[in-house]
Each structure stands twice: as structure tokens, then as C-alpha cells.
From Swiss-Prot:
Domain of life: Eukaryota
Species whose genome carries this gene: Pisum sativum
Protein name: Chalcone synthase 1A
Catalytic activity as recorded in UniProt: (E)-4-coumaroyl-CoA + 3 malonyl-CoA + 3 H(+) = 2',4,4',6'-tetrahydroxychalcone + 3 CO2 + 4 CoA
Pathway as given in its UniProt record: Secondary metabolite biosynthesis; flavonoid biosynthesis
Organism lineage: Eukaryota, Viridiplantae, Streptophyta, Embryophyta, Tracheophyta
Length: 389
């Protein structure tokens, strides 16, 4: 007779969870950061707020962002004037947009990941969908299942309202699913659209303006599984270890609240210092078992909440200037896409590593770290092992 322990052993994969493919997508509408303040204050009928516009211009200039992609065009905003006011009741209009557009953008990223993976979509066993852009029932996970034509018995997980740390969360969950379900192939999708947070400027809510200067739209998808099929599935990164922690004394550092006016964003100025003060503890926990204490010897993927966070982390740890190269590139080209950001960076790193003729997907290095930072203040840590390019 078979024992419970024997059944459990048979259910588990042998090797570590591995990323097999990555796909990304953005809306077609591209916004240049240099001209965005003019557009933003014009479309929100706020051109008379000259001092506020000058502040916003400085925020945009210091953001290290060149361009972003947004579903919201001038035409859409003119058709929905309530989105352009500050705190006008507008949740219905926002919901009507994102309930359709979030799964649609997610499908675009997922389709690219599935194509790179090279296996039939019928082999997908689990789906994790993550968004901070709107809520609905049945959720975006259900809508994506229909859009992609996945099997109706794919096991789905819907993560709403997690915010900017969630790119790490989805990898942590995917790792647990892949390693504890032999043969599992997990499709992970993060899709974010700023239609929930866009609103006109206010002198009394400057942290909302920070969000208007940083956030962009994007979706990213990865395929995760254990025990890659030889000559069929190409391993990109192994997910070796994960952790989640709430930073001490950080309550209220980053908040978001769903209101009649959409999703409001609140940010304390000391977020960069809170992150930089606590990041070394997370690194020690991850890398001490490997006897690694030189953090310039690993590759880096950090959620680019803004340039100040990256600057302070680099300064605190004495990181070389190019350590955050992939992270800064994604911030520059796309802005802060919340949960999707770190997956975009993962994609950029493996692409550039191959393009530059480096030996591994992690800039030629063996070990690396992925960090998600977000509401809480919550930090997600993922220890990565790179693979041959």
C-alpha cells in the first residue's frame, strides 16, 4: 500500500524552479517625458497653476525617465473628463477601461512568452495573474484564460492590489508551485495600466504628482517550471531562494487607497532611506549560505521605484555604477510599471548579456538578486542563479 509520504515525494519536482521564457508588452501610445508636463497640465486644464507646473517639470527632469507608454491618450481623456480632475468621482469610467485593457495587454505579453517557450499552451498547468489596476469578478485571470484559450482546468491564482513589490511575489509563488507539483508549467503575468491613478494636479497632494511623473503602463509574462526538458526548454534563470519581509517602522511609507476617484497614491519622502537602511539584512540572509559578501560580484535586478531609491542603495552598498545598468535602462525607457518592472529588467538583462557575448544570462556572473519594493513597506527578495547564454 502506498503511503502519504510516498505520494508526496512523487508529487514533487527534482530540480529548482526555472524561468524558461519572458515576454513583455506595452500600449502603442508613447509619451516623451520632456514634453509630458506641458501635455499633463493642458489636458487637466491646470495651466494656470504655474508654480505647480514648474515643480512637476523638475520632478520629470530628475526622474531619469526618457519615455513611458500609456493606454490613456488625449482622445480618451477628452472623452472622460472626470479622470482629468483632481479627486472627481470617476471609478466607473476607470473600471470600464482597465477591466478590458489589463487582460488584453497581459495576453500580448503572455503570447510572446509562450512563443519563446516553444511548447503548446495546453501544457500550462497553472496561471498567476497580478495587477494593481482595477478589480473585477471573475478576475483578470479568468479573462486571460479565455483570451489565450487555455484549458478550463488550469489552476488560477489572482493577485490584486499588491503594488510595486509584487514582481517578486509572483516569482515566489511560481517557485513554490513548480517545485511542489511535478511537471507543472506556470504562466505568470503582471499587467499594469495607469488609468486607475491618473488625475489632475493638486497643491495639497504632491505625492500624487510624484506618481504622475513616474508611472507607466506595461505587462510582462514568464513561464516557470522545474526539470527542463532537454533540448526542448531553455533555462534562463533558476529561482533558488525567496523571502518577503515588512521593513521595521515603515507603516504608511507607501499607501494606495481605492476610492470613488480611483486609486490614490501616498508616498513618504523617506522611502529611499528606509529601503537602503534595510537592504543589507536581506542580502545577508540570501547570500550568507553561499559565502558571498561582495555585492559587486552578483548581478542586480531592483524595482526602480524612482532614481533616489537606486542612488541610495548603490551608495549604501558601495555598488559600482554599472551594477544597476539593466534596472536604470528599464526605468529610462518605460518608467515605473509597478509589478511588471522587475520582469522587464529580467528580460533586458538576459537579452543584453547574450548580445554582449557574455557567458551567462546574468551579465556573465553566476549569482544575482531580484528585489521588489512596495506598500507596507514590503520587500521581496529572490535569489537567482543565471544560466548559460
Amino acid at each position: 500500500m502506498v503511503t502519504v509520504n510516498e505520494i508526496r515525494q512523487a508529487q514533487r519536482a527534482e530540480g529548482p524552479a526555472t524561468v524558461f521564457a519572458i515576454g513583455t508588452a506595452t500600449p502603442q501610445n508613447c509619451v516623451e517625458q520632456s514634453t509630458y508636463p506641458d501635455f499633463y497640465f493642458r489636458i487637466t486644464n491646470s495651466q494656470h497653476k504655474t508654480e505647480l507646473k514648474e515643480k512637476f517639470q523638475r520632478m520629470c527632469d530628475k526622474s531619469m525617465i526618457k519615455k513611458r507608454y500609456m493606454h490613456l491618450t488625449e482622445e480618451i481623456l477628452k472623452e472622460n473628463p472626470s479622470l482629468c480632475e483632481y479627486m472627481a468621482p470617476s471609478l466607473d469610467a476607470r473600471q470600464d477601461m482597465v477591466v478590458v485593457e489589463v487582460p488584453k495587454l497581459g495576453k500580448e505579453a503572455a503570447t510572446k512568452a509562450i512563443k519563446e517557450w516553444g511548447q503548446p499552451k495546453s501544457k500550462i498547468t497553472h496561471l498567476i495573474f497580478c495587477t494593481t489596476s482595477g478589480v473585477d469578478m471573475p478576475g483578470a485571470d479568468y479573462q486571460l484564460t479565455k483570451l489565450l484559450g487555455l484549458r478550463p482546468y488550469v489552476k488560477r491564482y489572482m493577485m490584486y492590489q499588491q503594488g510595486c513589490f509584487a514582481g517578486g511575489t509572483v516569482l515566489r509563488l511560481a517557485k513554490d508551485l513548480a517545485e511542489n507539483n511535478k511537471g507543472a508549467r506556470v504562466l505568470v503575468v503582471c499587467s499594469e495600466i495607469t488609468a486607475v491613478t491618473f488625475r489632475g494636479p493638486s497643491d495639497t497632494h504632491l505625492d500624487s504628482l510624484v506618481g504622475q511623473a513616474l508611472f507607466g503602463d506595461g505587462a510582462a509574462a514568464v513561464i516557470v517550471g522545474s526539470d527542463p526538458l532537454p533540448d526542448v526548454e531553455k533555462p534562463l534563470f533558476e529561482l533558488v531562494w525567496t523571502a518577503q519581509t515588512i521593513v521595521p517602522d515603515s507603516e504608511g511609507a507607501i499607501d494606495g487607497h481605492l476610492r470613488e476617484a480611483g486609486l490614490t497614491f501616498h508616498l513618504l519622502k523617506d522611502v529611499p532611506s528606509l529601503v537602503s537602511k534595510n537592504i543589507e539584512k536581506a542580502l545577508v540572509e540570501a547570500f550568507q549560505p553561499l559565502n558571498i559578501s561582495d555585492y559587486n560580484s552578483i548581478f542586480w535586478i531592483a524595482h526602480p521605484g524612482g532614481p533616489a531609491i537606486l542612488d541610495q542603495v548603490e551608495a549604501k552598498l558601495g555598488l559600482k555604477q554599472r551594477k544597476m545598468q539593466a534596472t536604470r535602462h528599464v526605468l529610462s525607457e518605460y518608467g515605473n510599471m509597478s509589478s511588471a518592472c522587475v520582469l522587464f529588467i529580467l528580460d533586458e538583462m538576459r537579452r543584453k548579456s547574450k548580445e554582449d557575448g557574455l557567458a551567462t544570462t546574468g551579465e556573465g556572473l553566476e549569482w544575482g538578486v531580484l528585489f521588489g519594493f512596495g506598500p507596507g513597506l514590503t520587500v521581496e527578495t529572490v535569489l537567482l542563479h543565471s544560466m548559460a547564454t
